[in-house]
Amino acid sequence: MIIEFNLLVILLVQMPLSFYMLYRLCYLLFCFLECFLNLFKKCGVFKNAKWLTRIQRVFYLYLFVYR
């Protein structure tokens, strides 16, 4: 019974909190990477920035799904 209760506490309390913190961390990472990707595009560091645009689209999709 104690083991089942501990498992229930982990599933209901600790996991959602860790997912919430993980979401916040990913959101901050996304903002940081988006800033650098836009900077690289504007400065012309890369001649072909198509792959940077694709990376940005993946990040936008990730944030749209997990919001």
From Swiss-Prot:
This is Uncharacterized protein ORF11. It is found in: Host membrane. GO terms for cellular component: host cell membrane; membrane. Keywords: Host membrane, Membrane, Transmembrane, Transmembrane helix. Belongs to the plectrovirus ORF11 family. It is a single-pass membrane protein. The chain crosses the membrane at residues 26-46.
